[in-house]
Amino acid sequence: MKIFDYEDIQLIPNKCIVESRSECDTTIQFGPKKFKLPVVPANMQTVMNEKLAKWFAENDYFYIMHRFDEEARIPFIKHMQNSGLFASISVGVKKAEFDFIEKLAQEKLIPEYITIDIAHGHSDSVINMIKHIKTHIPDSFVIAGNVGTPEGVRELENAGADATKVGIGPGRVCITKIKTGFGTGGWQLAALNICSKAARKPLIADGGIRTHGDIAKSIRFGASMVMIGSLFAAHEESPGETVELDGKQYKEYFGSASEFQKGEHKNVEGKKMFVEHKGSLMDTLKEMQQDLQSSISYAGGKDLKSLRTVDYVIVRNSIFNGDRD
């Protein structure tokens, strides 16, 4: 098995067939809807909130609302659907969450997307939740995770998941690999690659994205959608406190299993950091799209499919050659 991560890989260009990168199509059909980009902000409190979720839906971008304000979920679904927008929510696997799914069914509230969101998704509890959702609200598109193995992908798909999230602790504010010794940190792209060999349904690459080029690499190695946390954090529109440090503006960014999210120091697998203020989120999305269009042009195609078949070389952490200094 080849082991590598994003910084170890360089994709090899093919002959360009477009006059301009603007001809390249970055749209993706994911579940019942088509989106402008194959990216989704991480469903974290310092990355996504209701206001941003509405803006993303209005502008044909995918989003997943976090699950850390449980009482707000039903009003959120109603508000989004009454506004003619899609509802995309997260659930956990505790007993109350099973009751919540039944309540949605009773009220005939059908979110277009439901993400089962726990750190170790290859588990009986997630499999039971997938089956529970598919029994009570079968029309919802179910995303389950997170996993890091082909066996995990197969089991969640067999249980009824419509898509699977791949990634155990590779994110900047996730310390699972340090606290537990387990995870895909340092080999996330290889984990995605081996999981894609088993997948029959879409995969979401979750974690470890440091540059826009990593989006193209994720698609090459099997992702349909790419979940991004730190690159989407710390914008003008982002949730989170703004602080000034040494004359520069920063915003807080913390992991979903951090004590800052949990409100207690118990089973902590996330940390908090401050990310330098990045300006407008709209500008970042525009740049992300342009960079992905350039990736498609280098791949010798006109749409995302062309990225899936390009050749690559493994260069072992050398592609930056001091560019980060």
Curated annotation (Swiss-Prot):
InterPro entries found in the cross-reference section: Aldolase_TIM (IPR013785), GMP_reductase (IPR050139), GuaC_type_2 (IPR005994), IMP_DH/GMP_Rdtase_CS (IPR015875), IMP_DH_GMPRt (IPR001093)
Binding site for NADP(+): 203-226
Annotated active site: 174
EC number from the UniProt entry: 1.7.1.7
Biological processes annotated in GO: purine nucleotide metabolic process
Transmembrane segments: none
Molecular function (Gene Ontology), one example: GMP reductase activity
Source taxon at top rank: Bacteria
GO cellular component terms listed in the entry, alphabetical order: cytosol; GMP reductase complex
Family: Belongs to the IMPDH/GMPR family. GuaC type 2 subfamily.
Name listed for the protein in its UniProt record: GMP reductase
Organism expressing this protein natively: Staphylococcus aureus (strain Newman)
